[in-house]
Amino acid sequence: MIRLDTYETEKYWEEGVVTAEASAFFITPDGLAVTNCHSIEDSVRATATLSTGDVYPVESVVYYDAGIDIAVIRISKTALKGHDTTEFACLDIAPSGTGDLRTGDTVYAIGNPLGLGLAVSAGVISATERQVDRYELPCVMSTADISEGSSGGALLNVYGQAVAVTTGAYVYGNSMYLAVPIDPVLSADLTGEGQSLSAVSEALRVEA
């Protein structure tokens, strides 16, 4: 699991002023990680901090879709702080994505709530396809707690496979936490070098 720190300007980057914190998780050992699209918008730089304390720079964005709020980023193996690595520990994606989820299934949300570090919460699926205005795909709704900073974390099934990406909650409800299906990542082309964070942020501003 990753704590994702983003920087809105080069000046903030140079001064070490973090603009926002979010979560992300590796899906390949060579550094591809999933997060929310909204977690990287308006940023020109970002870093990934692991539970070991090692910090790695985000190199590029290889896939993003604001409509479904998912992005795949590439993280360097060369550390800014700590130890370089040859590979990252990663999560498996459920082969069917959300296809096998059923209401009442046990799930686990892992992320970086409030920037405090790795945390895990358990809950059940309360809806497998909840329509939410801001998302182009129906969301998974569960009772697994998430907080600010958890955006971009993983929602796992009982086999430890990622089925969705935690993204938000109904403010005026209780235990109504939302995650966007990870299914689009299964079919996305993740082979390219990708674009810089600043280029993607500019494109998202134009699209808005």
Predicted regions and their residues:
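Gly/Ser-enriched beta-turn/beta-hairpin loop segments
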Residues: 9-17, 63-68, 78-85, 127-141, ...
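Catalytic nucleophile loop of clan PA
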Residues: 25, 146-166
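A conserved glycine-rich beta-strand in the N-terminal activation segment of trypsin-fold
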Residues: 6-36, 54-58, 92, 120, ...
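Short conserved beta-strand and strand-loop elements enriched in small hydrophobics
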Residues: 2-4, 45-52, 105-112
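C-terminal cap/linker of serine protease catalytic domains
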Residues: 58, 77-87, 113, 162-208
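Flexible, gly/ser-rich surface segments that form the specificity/activation loops bordering the active-site cleft
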Residues: 83, 91-137, 147, 167-177
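Catalytic-histidine neighborhood of serine endopeptidases
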Residues: 18-21, 28-70, 75-78
